[in-house]
Design a protein with these regions (language model features):
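Short, hydrophobic/glycine-enriched beta-strand segments
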Residues: 4-10, 150
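Short beta-strand scaffold positions
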Residues: 55-56, 129, 151-152
Length: 208
């Protein structure tokens, strides 16, 4: 039953670079630098005999692990791994008004108010329900697998790591992320243990 999940965030998109809010409702592709990050991750981990690749339904995660998929590893998309919905903020530049709104929102979350969200967006409580359901599906899907590559999104990854380590989503910011950063998480059939925390070694020497 033991298996290891390599959980990564997608590569850079132009909207990441421009500071535009993406979220679940924005389906932007990787930019040239994001494709380089994906290539660097592939070169570093292509010898790992992954049994399965699981991504969100959004293009940026598909492109990040495209070479693993192209090599013939079975691939599953799961909407439960999609980014949080940022509601009315999605697709908008992070100007002062949006940034201050973001800061207030994340402060509320880290203060334990997990039932608040951007107008028309998702709350951490709603994300937890979505991610719990996704992980039940994923554990069932991977029960005969040993090594699984998961590509998801920044905020979604932080929240998922809280879920897997049985911590409140209020501590989500204790899990740093950057594009293609890796968390290696082992499952022993009962609980999850983080074996590698925020590994970005594959990005060494990669300039924008």
């Amino acid at each position: 039953l033991e298996r290891t999940f390599y959980i990564i965030r997608h590569g850079q998109t132009d909207l990441n670079k421009q500071g535009i809010v993406q979220g679940r409702g924005v389906n932007s592709p990787l930019n040239a630098h994001g494709l380089k990050q994906a290539e660097a991750f592939y070169e570093r981990y292509k010898e790992v005999p992954f049994d399965r690749v699981i991504t969100s339904t959004l293009l940026r995660t598909h492109q990040t692990v495209e070479k693993f998929i192209a090599s013939g590893i079975p691939w599953t998309q799961h909407a439960g791994l999609d980014e949080i919905s940022w509601g009315v903020y999605e697709g908008k530049p992070q100007d002062e008004e949006i940034m201050s709104g973001f800061e207030r929102l994340v402060k509320s979350w880290t203060d334990g108010m997990l039932d608040v969200c951007v107008d028309q967006g998702e709350t951490p409580d709603e994300m937890k329900i979505r991610q719990e359901s996704a992980m039940l599906d994923i554990l069932e899907l991977t029960k005969s697998d040993k090594l699984v590559l998961i590509c998801t999104h920044g905020r979604a990854m932080r929240m998922l790591l809280c879920l897997l380590t049985e911590q409140s989503y209020a501590v989500m910011d204790s899990f740093p992320h950057t594009n293609t950063a890796l968390y290696k998480v082992r499952y022993d059939g009962e609980k999850f243990t983080i074996d590698e925390f925020y590994n970005t070694e594959h990005l060494n020497g990669l300039n924008e």
